[in-house]
């Protein structure tokens, strides 16, 4: 078993922390590691936006629960890192542990925090659409893709318009339609046609 996949493949279980939310570890892996803000920035954002609901004893949403768990895991990991730093005599070994935690576990926590904060902020469907859009963009050869990657904060505007379906019907028919309709062909509006 590869050591870098151990947290999600622990004890032979195929556990993907994003699966129940419609995403996968692979889908998030399209985003480069420097895309994700620092853990400190993400924790500050979560606290500023969702402190009350995160501290509440009420169940708000699965994203709140997952966010609580990620924050608690990071706290425990920092406690362990502090203990290792204070108790491991060999500086080279200490540096290896700290670097491993920051590089591997830090990235996984940053991904989890970003995903759940983004889902709470923008909506799960928008975040999933963004991940797919970015995945398509990054895999498209540079010569055939737009120069700039999709931006999550701009997706809700386009997503909302597209999700509403067709644009509302105009109240007045076009002149062409008005001329072509004869009195005997006009129908009274039925409840089904008003949807």
UniProtKB/Swiss-Prot annotation:
Protein's UniProt keywords contain Metal-binding: no
Region feature (3 X 7 AA repeats of S-P-R-R-R-[PR]-S): 167-188
GO cellular component: host cell; host cell cytoplasm; T=4 icosahedral viral capsid
Main location: virion
SUBUNIT field: Homodimerizes, then multimerizes. Interacts with cytosol exposed regions of viral L glycoprotein present in the reticulum-to-Golgi compartment. Interacts with human FLNB. Phosphorylated form interacts with host importin alpha; this interaction depends on the exposure of the NLS, which itself depends upon genome maturation and/or phosphorylation of the capsid protein. Interacts with host NUP153.
Domain of life: Viruses
Motif (Bipartite nuclear localization signal): 170-187
UniProt keyword terms in alphabetical order: Capsid protein, Cytoplasmic inwards viral transport, DNA-binding, Host cytoplasm, Host-virus interaction, Microtubular inwards viral transport, Phosphoprotein, Repeat, RNA-binding, T=4 icosahedral capsid protein, Viral penetration into host nucleus, Virion, Virus entry into host cell
Gene Ontology molecular function terms on file: DNA binding; RNA binding; structural molecule activity
Compartment(s) where it occurs, according to its Swiss-Prot or TrEMBL record: Virion; Host cytoplasm
Species this protein is from: Hepatitis B virus genotype G (isolate IG29227/2000) (HBV-G)
Residues covered by region (RNA binding): 189-195
PTM per Swiss-Prot/TrEMBL: Phosphorylated by host SRPK1, SRPK2, and maybe protein kinase C or GAPDH. Phosphorylation is critical for pregenomic RNA packaging. Protein kinase C phosphorylation is stimulated by HBx protein and may play a role in transport of the viral genome to the nucleus at the late step during the viral replication cycle.
Modified residues (Phosphoserine): 167, 174, 182
Sequence repeats: 167-172, 174-180, 182-188
Name of this protein: Capsid protein
Signal peptide: none
Transmembrane segments: none
GO BP, sorted A to Z: microtubule-dependent intracellular transport of viral material towards nucleus; symbiont entry into host cell; viral penetration into host nucleus
């Amino acid at each position: 078993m590869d050591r870098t996949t151990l947290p999600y493949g622990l004890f032979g279980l195929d556990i993907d922390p994003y699966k129940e939310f419609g995403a996968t570890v692979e889908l998030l892996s399209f985003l480069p590691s420097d895309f994700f803000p620092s853990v400190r920035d993400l924790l500050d954002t979560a606290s500023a936006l969702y402190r009350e609901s995160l501290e509440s004893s009420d169940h708000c949403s699965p994203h709140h629960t997952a966010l609580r768990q990620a924050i608690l895991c990071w706290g425990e990991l920092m406690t362990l890192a502090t203990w290792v730093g204070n108790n491991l005599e060999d500086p080279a070994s200490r540096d290896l542990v700290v670097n491993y935690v920051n590089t591997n576990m830090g990235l996984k926590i940053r991904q989890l925090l970003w995903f759940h904060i983004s889902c709470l902020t923008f909506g799960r469907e928008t975040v999933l659409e963004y991940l797919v859009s970015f995945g398509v963009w990054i895999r498209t050869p540079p010569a055939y893709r737009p120069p700039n990657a999709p931006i999550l904060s701009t997706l809700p505007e386009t997503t909302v318009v597209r999700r509403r379906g067709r644009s509302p019907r105009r109240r007045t028919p076009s002149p062409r339609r008005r001329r072509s309709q004869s009195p005997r062909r006009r129908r009274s509006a039925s409840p089904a046609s008003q949807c």
